[in-house]
Amino acid sequence: MPSAIEAIYIILIAGELTIGIWGNGFIVLVNCIDWLKRRDVSLIDIILISLAISRICLLXVISLDGFFMLLFPTTYGNSVLVSIVBIVWTFANNSSLWFTSCLSIFYLLKIANISHPFFFWLKLKINKVILAILLGSFLISLVISVXMNDDMWYHLFKVSHEENITWEFKVSKIPGTFKQLTLNLGAMVPFILCLISFSLLLFSLVRHTKQIQLXATGFRDPSTEAHMRAIKAVIIFLLLLIVYYPVFLVMTSSALIPQGKLVLMIGDIVTITFPSSHSFILIMGNSKLREAFLKMLRFVKRFLRRRKPFVP
């Protein structure tokens, strides 16, 4: 019988999982249907599909890890399953962060106007550049996740069962923990790329605004609006990542912290919020996805209205 804290944990994780799978699944479904209709796919659609799929995998593996931890506390920590979950988690987490950095770079190259030969060359080769980054992101994530497969969880912690379930941590956990922390620090690179993209977008916006003021036009042009939308999207991602990444690192080192099980439970709830909530920000920030989402809401509203029982 789960305790009150465990019951709250299960309810929150199940709710966030449902919302996250629905939001990211919606992104994949709408873009794939559009792909089949037009028999062509745009670069932004490829990025969003890749990002949404990685987020679905991340949501699922975080949830599975939490449920296994509660349901099989005495065997899960020493099983092969925990190694598989950890590898998939590492791959999905890193690929999600890298694909998001690809989205930020796409916004930068598509919208910003920077008078530098190298930047101009990148804009001309935007399709090849972004596809190369996407492929590189996939390979980097794969290499990092494979490097985790050395039975490190066996050295990370040992679960013992007493009268009440307790988590008994050993000194041998330290090498595995530090290795995982070191590998996961590599996920700071996508964050830095997003920060650079934000800085350059802001620089481009300031310069563009000055040009408008010199031309004495008293209204926002499409370029200014595009700059603002891109900057807002990158800022939101950076804010979410600032919350997500430290919590993820704490979870990675939870074996070194007292009450490690409680830390993992709180960490799961916080980390699953990032891929769940960001999907709806992406939907509302993309005209095609936003239109499809609003159309679906109108359909649901009409459907519920028709099913409403008649009251004389």
From Swiss-Prot:
One of its GO terms (molecular function) is G protein-coupled receptor activity. Residues 1-9, 73-86, 147-180, 258-261 are extracellular. The keyword Chaperone does not apply. Keywords: G-protein coupled receptor, Glycoprotein, Membrane, Receptor, Sensory transduction, Taste, Transducer, Transmembrane, Transmembrane helix. It comes from the Eukaryota. The chain crosses the membrane at residues 10-32, 53-72, 87-109, 129-146, 181-203, 235-257, 262-284. InterPro entries: GPCR_Rhodpsn_7TM, TAS2R. PROSITE patterns: G_PROTEIN_RECEP_F1_2 (PS50262). The keyword Membrane applies. Glycans are attached at residue 164. One of its GO terms (cellular component) is plasma membrane. Residues 33-52, 110-128, 204-234, 285-312 are cytoplasmic. It is a multi-pass membrane protein. It is found in: Membrane. Belongs to the G-protein coupled receptor T2R family. Gustducin-coupled receptor implicated in the perception of bitter compounds in the oral cavity and the gastrointestinal tract. Signals through PLCB2 and the calcium-regulated cation channel TRPM5. Several bitter taste receptors are expressed in a single taste receptor cell. This is Taste receptor type 2 member 9.
